[in-house]
UniProtKB/Swiss-Prot annotation:
Family affiliation: Belongs to the methyltransferase superfamily. RlmKL family.
Residue ranges annotated for the THUMP domain, each copy included: 47-158
Catalytic activity: guanosine(2445) in 23S rRNA + S-adenosyl-L-methionine = N(2)-methylguanosine(2445) in 23S rRNA + S-adenosyl-L-homocysteine + H(+); guanosine(2069) in 23S rRNA + S-adenosyl-L-methionine = N(2)-methylguanosine(2069) in 23S rRNA + S-adenosyl-L-homocysteine + H(+)
EC numbers on record: 2.1.1.173, 2.1.1.264
NCBIfam families, sorted: PRK11783.1
Encoding gene (name): rlmL
Alphabetized HAMAP family for the sequence: 23SrRNA_methyltr_KL (MF_01858)
Source species: Colwellia psychrerythraea (strain 34H / ATCC BAA-681) (Vibrio psychroerythus)
Protein name: Ribosomal RNA large subunit methyltransferase K/L
Protein purpose: Specifically methylates the guanine in position 2445 (m2G2445) and the guanine in position 2069 (m7G2069) of 23S rRNA.
UniProt cross-references to Pfam families, sorted A to Z: Methyltrans_SAM, RlmL_1st, THUMP, UPF0020
Keyword rRNA processing found: yes
Length: 715
């Protein structure tokens, strides 16, 4: 008699669906259909058990219980009620409902799940059973409802917790690769076509790819050691049929292991992570088939025998500071491959496809995957005679320093500034500022650190070209300047409006100290787009400080108070520092403390500078004003535009200026035009200072800032 079949749904990660379709068919399922949400198939109960034990690519196996229209809450409740729940599980069994999808009437998963839960509980109560309890954290049985186009399908979570959890991984690295994705990568790499050839993971982390590969080569059932299953509390579960399938899977796996002969190698630079990989391999009882070595990938030599496959999942360079080292590693790794790994297959998974260009190799195939929330590609390369033929003797010629216009310009700029830097004892300066339009970056030096700021490419530049140029910059800058890649910080700078330039990027709370003309400044290169010190105003700080000796200074829009600090160090009589941000005002106080400056003559005021200036009754000898180009902060009643409002700002500042006093006014608005006529009506004379306040490292950029000295007109 033919066994009755039921409909199942196998879920997986995006990019794996096609492979899962093939796998489910190969395991004997009927009517296999691939859809965006997963792979549907018909199977007997025995085959459902078998597929759950043998699938490597599914994350879950779901068993269909029923379906129905669900345009609104009432229809959803009715569809859930059409299933006889006391036939599914006992009232003493805890349960949970997961809901996927939404519609105009059913707008969130919590509402949908609650409606189905109510239908289940009501049905038990109406049939005279005890009310079953919900347990969201550790239910004994789980259900999933999937809403699509006003139709809901309700499933039993047949397999239970994620099938990718094989049970051998106790610990993992910072960015673990799920086992089902690792299996998909192994299939796509082609290594399974001939497992007698070596497989190498040069950045093996916790060993997932290697353990999964050995298990696949041995034709093991991946779930035979699983301790719990979703169907165990299901009333139609047939334990005799299940035990038969489990025994068959165990026996088959043990028999296949006896014939296993593989050469698999794992390499990682992190000894701690490598110990984890070794323990995971022991847990999987596959440690004897994997040779682990602790070393840098770029120190890896080809001692693996015949050509095989290199498959790995390198870091993606998502965090500040990671990318420069990765760029260099990819360049070196590409050179290593050309020199030592002829006729090998290379497979690399990355979310940063731009890094692949640094290999200087041509991929013959790319597959799209999702690694968690990240869009990734698996790039495949065959290192045949065509790959790198022009560089067979000297692969480094791909990156010849003498051929790089950017590298040559960097060396030229460094040479031009060398004497000036030495004579002025300058620790923080700009070395490059978009000198070559194709390399649209700014490069700053802060002591032993290198900061690369990528300017957003104009729309006329192709995105791929801009990314390629940036990779060259990241590669060459630390090399030319002899700065280790772990001392390189990369930032992207688009046009900033208002307070955007002060938004937090990271939360490292790291800082370093920079000395500028005898004043010490706290610098943070990691957490914000700007560092706490505007380098282009180095000379401005000197001029204002000298003008303020023995005088009172008001510093408006003070940021981290660098002008105030320099003035205090050089002997200002009193200083009032005003800024709207508590964060930056605290930073200003840190700068004062760093220079051992304290006392009542230094005041720090957190306020909207525009509003404070209107109410201020004190007078100052020198006023420094460096407003934003535009601001509409939540703390401000009105917006501020420096072109539109600069006369009003200076008018208000004039009321706080002592007779014989001086206002230093500066801003960063390109094409700014000061209103001389309006200032003249106020009895003021403005002297352009921009050429004077630009120091040598900013001499190439005449638009970096605008500055004026404003005084009352002599009568």
């Amino acid at each position: 008699m033919k066994e009755s079949t039921q409909q199942f749904l196998a879920l997986t990660s995006p990019g794996i669906e096609v492979l899962l379709f093939d796998e489910i068919k190969s395991l004997g399922a009927f009517n296999v259909i691939q859809k965006p949400e997963g792979v549907y198939f018909q199977a007997s109960l025995a085959l459902g058990y078998k597929i759950s034990l043998w699938t490597r690519l599914a994350t879950r196996i779901m068993l269909k219980l029923g379906e129905g229209e669900a345009k609104d809450k009432d229809e959803l409740f009715k569809a859930a009620s059409s299933i006889n729940w006391p036939d599914i599980f006992k009232s003493t069994t805890t349960f949970a409902v997961d809901f996927v999808g939404y519609s105009e009437e059913i707008r969130n998963s919590q509402f949908g799940g609650l409606t189905i839960k109510d239908a289940i509980v009501d049905q038990f109560r109406d049939q005279g059973f005890e009310r079953p309890n919900v347990d969201k954290k550790a239910p004994q049985i789980s259900f999933q409802a999937r809403l699509l186009r006003d139709n809901v399908t309700i499933f039993l979570d047949f397999s239970g917790r994620g099938l990718f959890q094989r049970g051998y991984r106790e610990h993992s690295g910072a960015a673990p690769l799920k086992e089902n994705l690792a299996a998909a990568l192994i299939i796509r790499s082609g290594w399974l076509n001939d497992t007698s050839k070596p497989l190498v993971d040069p950045m093996c982390g916790s060993g997932t790819i290697l353990i999964e590969a050995v298990s696949m080569a041995a034709k093991q059932a991946p779930a035979i050691n699983r301790q719990s299953w979703g169907f165990e509390a299901w009333l139609s579960h047939d334990n005799a049929v299940w035990q038969k399938q489990l025994t068959l899977a165990i026996d088959s796996s043990e028999e296949n292991m006896s014939n296993l002969k593989v050469k698999v190698f794992g390499i990682d630079i992190d000894e701690r992570v490598l110990r984890t990989a070794q323990q995971n391999a022991r847990n999987a009882q596959l440690h004897q088939y994997i040779e682990f070595t602790c070393k840098n990938t770029n120190d890896m030599d080809n001692t693996f025998g015949q050509p095989g496959t290199i498959l790995f999942n390198p870091p993606y360079g998502e965090r500040i500071g990671e990318l420069p080292e990765l760029v260099e590693n990819f360049v070196l790794f590409g050179q290593k491959l050309k020199m030592q790994f002829k006729d090998w297959r290379i497979a690399i998974l990355t979310a940063n496809v731009d890094l692949l260009s640094m290999l200087k190799l041509s991929s013959f195939k790319r597959y799209k995957f999702k690694n968690g929330p990240l869009d990734c590609q698996l790039a495949l390369y065959n290192l045949d005679a065509k790959q790198g033929a022009k560089d067979a003797i000297n692969p480094q010629s791909d990156f010849a320093e003498e051929d790089s216009a950017f590298a040559n310009r960097l060396k030229k700029n460094r040479k031009n500034l060398k004497g000036w830097l030495k004579s002025n004892e300058i620790e923080a300066y700009r070395l490059y500022d978009g000198d070559i339009p194709e390399y649209n970056v700014a490069i700053d030096i802060y002591g032993e650190y290198l900061v690369i700021q990528e300017y957003a490419a104009p729309k006329t530049i192709e995105e791929d070209k801009a990314k390629k140029r940036l990779q060259e910059v990241i590669y060459w800058a630390p090399k030319v300047l002899n700065i280790p890649t772990d001392k390189v910080i990369l930032k992207t700078r688009a046009k900033q409006r208002g307070a955007n330039q002060y938004e937090r990027l990271e939360k490292t709370k790291q800082s370093l100290t920079i000395n500028e003309h005898g004043a010490l400044f706290k610098i943070n290169l990691w957490d914000y787009l700007d560092t706490g010190l505007f380098l282009d105003h180095r000379k401005t700080r000197q001029i204002v400080a000298k003008k303020s000796q023995g005088k009172s200074l008001l510093n408006l829009f003070a940021y981290t108070g660098s002008v105030s600090v320099q003035a205090a160090v050089q002997g200002a009589a009193s200083i009032t520092t005003v800024d709207m941000s508590n964060t930056y005002l605290n930073w200003a106080e840190d700068n004062f403390a760093l220079n051992k400056l304290n006392g009542h003559k230094y005041q720090f005021i957190q306020a909207d500078c525009l509003d404070w200036l209107k109410k201020n009754v004190n007078k100052f000898d020198v006023i420094f004003i460096d407003p934003p180009t535009f601001s509409n902060s939540k703390r401000m009643e009105d917006s501020f535009d420096v072109q539109r409002d600069h006369v009003d700002l200076i008018t208000d500042a004039l009321k706080s200026l002592n007779r014989g006093g001086e206002i230093f006014f500066t801003n960063n608005k390109r094409n700014f035009k000061i209103d001389f006529e309006a200032l003249d009506e106020l009895g003021l004379t403005a002297e352009a200072m921009s050429d004077v306040t630009r120091d040598k490292d900013f001499a190439r950029n005449k638009h970096i800032h605008n500055s004026w000295s404003i005084k009352r007109t002599a009568t």
